[in-house]
Amino acid sequence: MSLSSKLTVKDLSLAGKRVFIRVDFNVPLDGKTITSNQRIVAALPTIKYVLEQGPKAVVLASHLGRPNGERNEKYSLAPVAAELEKLLGQKVNFLDDCVGEHVTAAVNGAAAGSVFLLENLRFHIEEEGSRKVDGEKVKASAEDVQKFRQGLMSLADVYVNDAFGTAHRAHSSMVGFELPERAGGFLLSRELEYFSKALENPTRPFLAILGGAKVADKIQLIDNLLDKVDSIVIGGGMAFTFKKVLENMEIGNSIYDKAGAEIVPKLAEKAKKNGVKIVLPVDFVIGDDFSQDANTKIVSASEGIPSGWEGLDCGPESRKLFSETIASAKTIVWNGPPGVFEIPKFSEGTQAMLAAAVKASEAGSTVIIGGGDTATVAKKYGVVEKISHVSTGGGASLELLEGKDLPGVTFLSSKQ
């Protein structure tokens, strides 16, 4: 799947058309109050561009939360419609469902240039294809799924996907539009542009930085990246399994992944064969408790971590080593923080790495931060604007880095 060959919204002729845009308005809510409108703001460039082209109607569709395939007012998109109206400076017609005769009639009978927001797609089991009942998975029938997709399609002449965060899901609104023109919006296209640059044509040296607790969860990721990168920094809880297996380091009560430990030698062997340098921490900030009240000290890898203590961040020498490694790379993909950044006294390693990433970005290197925790870190320390690209999709970016195809991207039309 070449990421750079997909149709974008700019390739479409939109005048007089009903334009269906799959957006990601899965915003955090406190009751009916939106606590962060970031995802709505992120979709505005695509929505505004489409409106400037003189469409008949713009139909916006999204999921919100996990209503388990049934209507649940707690997950209504009504508050989003009000917020979008404010941001767009134009009336947004909120429809109380996403399919049905009254929905189709409203869209088809609209004045030119009208904007509609449909109710939560996941109020229908047919969007995800299944729901949980008493802990058991119950599938929607193929006929019902087809009918639901036809209902969505009846609202559209062209389809635009701007929901990168859901691109790894083969849901109806992602892969159900059998229309001649299916394009990526600006947000999705930007994601694809950066990931294709890194994964298909990187400027070298290419560095991957990986954190997270379990090696077993990241096997496919590490394995795929070992075919692409020049060096790889392993931090976070994962580092202890690597240090114990490869260097026989004493790790005290630090996190140890027994299943992952069996694979570490194979990964190290592959790295050696491919000429990829594995960079591990050389010292640690350890604590006698997983809290801000913990007693702490710094130990080197050769000293090891005593029993009753656990490694919760990388130490000052490791920070220096990681910063130098980052400074010498031209393409950097970072997925997972190197320490327990949520606890201030164990956040210095993460802050140092972030500072090095910003510096590299400013010096002209391409720095891509995968979604999830690492994106949270970039937001927390206010550096999103200073990094080449902070991904909006945790699961989707991870699957791309693992070498998997994303159904929502594969489904888009290719440029002729």
Swiss-Prot record:
Pathway: Carbohydrate degradation; glycolysis; pyruvate from D-glyceraldehyde 3-phosphate: step 2/5. ADP binds at G212, G236, F341. It is found in: Cytoplasm; Mitochondrion. ATP binds at A213, K218, G237, G311, E342, D373, T374. Its cofactor is Mg(2+). GO terms for cellular component: cytosol; mitochondrion. Mg(2+) binds at A213, A216, D217, D373. GO terms for molecular function: ADP binding; ATP binding; metal ion binding; phosphoglycerate kinase activity. Catalyzes one of the two ATP producing reactions in the glycolytic pathway via the reversible conversion of 1,3-diphosphoglycerate to 3-phosphoglycerate. Both L- and D- forms of purine and pyrimidine nucleotides can be used as substrates, but the activity is much lower on pyrimidines. Negatively regulates the biosynthesis of acetyl-CoA from pyruvate in the mitochondrion. This is Phosphoglycerate kinase. The lineage of its organism: Eukaryota, Fungi, Dikarya, Ascomycota, Saccharomycotina.
